Structures are given as C-alpha cells and as structure tokens.
Curated annotation (Swiss-Prot):
Native organism: Sarocladium strictum (Black bundle disease fungus)
Pfam family for this entry, one: Inhibitor_I9
Protein role: Extracellular elicitor protein that induces a strong defense response in strawberry and confers both local and systemic plant resistance against the fungal pathogen Colletotricum acutatum, the casual agent of anthracnose disease. AsES activates a cascade of defense responses, including calcium influx, oxidative burst, hypersensitive cell-death response (HR), accumulation of autofluorescent compounds, cell-wall reinforcement with callose and lignin deposition, salicylic acid accumulation, and expression of defense-related genes, such as PR1, PG1, MYB30, RBOH-D, RBOH-F, CHI23, and FLS.
Localisation per UniProt entry: Secreted
Peptidase S8 domain location: 114-388
InterPro entries given in the database record: PCSK9_ProteinaseK-like (IPR034193), Peptidase_S8/S53_dom (IPR000209), Peptidase_S8/S53_dom_sf (IPR036852), Peptidase_S8_Asp-AS (IPR023827), Peptidase_S8_His-AS (IPR022398), Peptidase_S8_Ser-AS (IPR023828), Peptidase_S8_subtilisin-like (IPR050131), Peptidase_S8_subtilisin-rel (IPR015500)
Protein name: Subtilisin-like serine protease AsES
Disulfide bonds: C141-C230, C285-C357
Applications: AsES can be combined well with commercial spray adjuvants, insecticides, herbicides and fungicides without losing any defense-inducing activity. The agricultural biostimulant PSP1, a formulation based on AsES is therefore a very promising candidate to efficiently control multiple fungal diseases under field conditions in monocot and dicot crops.
C-alpha cells in the first residue's frame, strides 16, 4: 500500500512546474514620466521555447497588451500581484519590468533665467531664457569639493547630499559650496537640473584648507564613485586653488584617470593659470570667467591652459540659510562647466572624462570674448541648443 501511494504521487510531482531558487528580477524604470499601474513587460530567456511563453500567457486574467515573438521574447499586459508572483517563479523568465510612459526628448526654456544660464544656451548675447533638453543631467552624479553644501536647501529638490568633511563640521558654514552646487544643479539656478549633488567638504567655514586635506577629499570621491549608482557618469568641481603644487595636480589627475570629469577654476589673480593648481593640470577642464558683456572678467586668470570660459561675474545661485546670493569669481564659472558636463553626459552618454572636456571645447562659441591676452583660447561655453 505504501509503495502504491508513492507511485500514485509521482505523476503529480513530475507534472508540477519547476520553481527557481530566487524570483526573477522585478525592475522599476527610473527617470521616466510615469509608471503604468499594474502593467508589466515579461521578458523570457533567449533560449526559451515559445511554448513556455504560451504557458505564461495562460496565467493572465485578460488579454495581453503585446506578445513578442521576435528577438525579444515575452509579452506585456495587466498582471495582478498573485500572477506576478507565479511568473517570477518561472525559471524561463529572465526578468519583469513595470511598463512606463516614454515621451520624445524635448527642449524646454526657463524664462527670465540667471544670465549665466541664458548665455550658455545661445550663440548670441541677448536672450534671457535658458533653453535645455529636459534630460537635464538625469543619471549623473556631481561632486562638489568645496566648503560643503546645504543639502536640504529647497532649491535642490531632495537631490543633494553632504557626504563627508575634512574640515570640522559637516555643514557648509561659508556658503561658497552651496552656491557652487546651485549653479551645477539646483532647480532654478542650475545647468543640470536633475543631477545628484554630492558635497565633499575640504575647505573650512572661512574658506581655507590644506593641500593634504584636499587630496584626502579627492581620494574620497574616487572611492565613493566606485560604489555609487551614477549610470550616466560622474563629474566633479573644484572651485579652489593656490600656488603651483605637483601633489595637488597629481591628485586632480587621479580623478580623470578614474573616469571622473573635473572642472576647476582658473583662479582670480589675473595671471597665467599655469602658475596655480589644480588649474595648471593639463588633464582637467580649466575654466576662466566672463562678464555679461562677453568680456574676460577683470580678475580671471588666462593663458593657453584655460580650456573654456563661462559666466563668472554677478552670478545668482543658492546660499546657506535656504537663501540666494550673487557673487563673482572663476569659482562661479567652473560650476557652469561641471553642470554642462553633467548635462551633456545625461543627454549624450558619458564618453570618458577627457573626452567630455573635449566635447565641451568643440561645442564652444568661438571668437566672441573681448579682452583676452594673446595665446588664450577664445572659447565661450555653449550647451548645444539646436535653436541657439
């Protein structure tokens, strides 16, 4: 009797579907306009016979939205929670992803934008709107190596994080870093309005710091970037500098070597940028400052090592205390380029750290800046706006 009972159960056991050890991955798309409720795309493994897809279709309570019989094998449709669980247990299923709304990439214009934003989205001086693709740096990370950032500033929209401090308190007690972060990626004052902003504090609340501390901050960025999800790449900004330092230049180069784009301020001494660091490091993107009249800002450093110029005088941006401030310097020009790097990486993909600087140089408006000393490249940043 015992033997016959076991034998009687065998056909049932053999007829049961095989279960997998772990459920198939369930993906939720990021940075989309909207998700479609209870609607999923079921992707089967490439080696799966289509009969397995047919078996999955039988689980649906209604008609499928699409059946895929080509290179992409599977189906889509409304799937309730119980059926979703059954499908995820099917070893033939590769993954399941929630359906989402996808729209044409569109350019949008921010009316009455800060003058610096307006200037980098047009070839000619005059327009007051900032025109940009609404990808806006999505999927990128922007490291601000500075005085820290006020991460909870309302204009950062929850996209900002103060990570670490090598100078006392983790808070930005100066305002400089928060201003820089705002130009890179704040909602109102930023170039790349969807980038993630990451603060690394290497300067004190009085605005000073040691070379050794800055190097420690750079090493932190390299380490952090390896474990952080930034699918469209990472950029960094250093709106700081001092006399020539082989150590600081070497540390700045290590960011490039680790495929992190770096924009640095050319300096505010009205001298050759070859005399200061990290602006003199050849592999970084060194940024000089211009005025709203397209003249070299009187304070801006210059020379053949300046890759690009960007707005840097009377720049309105975020400030500590959840406020705003208008200040000047190549410190304000550099984040326009860090933001532009994040913007282009989100729009076109990340081509590599040095290649991204080359892309910015290639896009630049040439020959419009007045007052440049001989030998200084006459290149003003431009975001590639097709109507610009």
């Amino acid at each position: 009797m015992r033997l016959s009972l076991v034998l009687a159960l065998l056909p049932v056991a053999f007829g049961a579907p095989t279960r997998r050890d772990e459920p198939a991955p369930l993906h939720v798309p990021r940075d989309v306009d909207s998700l479609i409720k209870d609607t999923y795309i079921v992707k089967y493994k490439d080696i799966t016979a289509f009969s397995a897809v047919d078996e999955g279709l039988k689980l649906l309570s209604g008609k499928p939205k699409h059946i895929y019989k080509g290179a992409f094998k599977g189906f889509s449709g409304k799937i309730d929670a119980k059926t979703l669980e059954l499908l995820r247990d099917d070893p033939s299923v590769d993954f399941i992803e929630q359906d989402a709304i996808v729209t044409l990439a569109a350019y949008t214009t921010q009316a009455s934008a800060p003058w610096g934003l307006a200037r980098i989205s047009t070839r000619q001086r005059g327009p007051t709107g900032y025109t940009y693709d609404d990808s806006a740096g999505a999927g990128t990370c922007s490291y601000i190596i500075d005085t820290g950032i006020q991460a909870n500033h309302p204009n950062f929209g929850g996209r900002a994080f103060q990570l670490v401090s090598y100078q006392g308190s983790n808070a930005d007690g100066n305002g400089h870093g928060t201003h820089v972060a705002g130009t890179i990626g704040s909602t109102t004052y930023g170039v790349a309005k969807r980038t993630t902003l990451l603060g690394v504090k290497v300067l004190s609340d009085s605005g000073s710091g040691s070379t050794s501390g800055i190097i420690a901050g750079i090493n932190y960025v390299v380490s952090d970037s390896r474990s952080r999800s930034c699918p469209n790449g990472s950029v960094a900004n250093m709106s700081l500098g001092g006399g020539y330092s082989a150590s600081l230049n070497s540390a700045a180069k290590s960011l490039i070597d680790n495929n992190i784009f770096l924009a640095v301020a050319a300096g505010n001494e009205n001298q050759n940028a070859a005399n200061v660091s990290p602006a003199s490091e050849p592999t970084v993107c060194t940024v000089g400052a211009t005025t709203s009249a397209d003249a070299k800002a009187s304070f801006s450093n210059y020379g053949s090592g300046v890759d690009i110029f960007a707005p840097g005088q009377s720049i309105l941006s975020t400030w500590i205390g959840s406020s705003t401030n208008t200040i000047s310097g190549t410190s304000m020009a550099s984040p326009h380029i860090a933001g532009l790097a994040a913007y282009l990486a989100g729009l076109e993909g990340f081509p590599g750290a040095q290649a991204l600087c080359n892309r910015i140089v290639a896009l630049a408006t040439t020959g419009v800046i007045t007052g440049l000393p001989s030998g200084t490249p006459n290149r003003l940043a431009f975001n590639g706006n097709p109507s610009g």
